[in-house]
């Protein structure tokens, strides 16, 4: 099945502590989760690694978030949108349901 949300898509968070925030998809995981830039930040306690000259401490990084909690952002309407699929010139492409505009 083709993915409705892919890497480098601009998405908006629908639910949770980051509701309403927008970000760019960095990575799509096979478990139905994605990692979004600047969204779902968690603090990790990291031990120092002297061999690699890495200091220890508390590091903030992005955690995975469920795809169902995200929607693709339509820049033309300025809102979250749903994604559909259609064939154009023999290729399967994604489009916004609200205005039928093809997604890059």
Curated annotation (Swiss-Prot):
GO cellular component entries: cytosol; ribonucleoprotein complex; ribosome
InterPro entries reported in the protein's UniProt record: KOW (IPR005824), Rib_uL2_dom2 (IPR014722), Ribosomal_uL24 (IPR003256), Ribosomal_uL24_CS (IPR005825), Ribosomal_uL24_KOW (IPR041988), Translation_prot_SH3-like_sf (IPR008991)
GO MF, one annotated term: rRNA binding
Alphabetically ordered keywords of this record: Ribonucleoprotein, Ribosomal protein, RNA-binding, rRNA-binding
GO process annotations (BP): translation
SUPFAM superfamilies: Translation proteins SH3-like domain
NCBIfam families in UniProt: rplX_bact
Record's subunit section: Part of the 50S ribosomal subunit.
Family statement drawn from the similarity comment of this UniProt entry: Belongs to the universal ribosomal protein uL24 family.
Known function: One of two assembly initiator proteins, it binds directly to the 5'-end of the 23S rRNA, where it nucleates assembly of the 50S subunit.
Protein name, as recorded: Large ribosomal subunit protein uL24
Organism: Klebsiella pneumoniae (strain 342)
């Amino acid at each position: 099945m083709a993915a409705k949300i892919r890497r480098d898509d601009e998405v908006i968070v629908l639910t949770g502590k980051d509701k309403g925030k927008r970000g760019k998809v960095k990575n799509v995981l096979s478990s139905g989760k994605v990692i979004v830039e600047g969204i779902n930040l968690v603090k990790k306690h990291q031990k120092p690694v002297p061999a690699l000259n890495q200091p220890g401490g508390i590091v903030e990084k992005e955690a995975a978030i469920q795809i169902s909690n995200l929607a693709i952002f339509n820049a033309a309407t300025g809102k979250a949108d749903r994604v559909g699929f259609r064939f154009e010139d023999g290729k399967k492409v994604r489009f916004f349901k609200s205005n039928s505009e093809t997604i890059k």
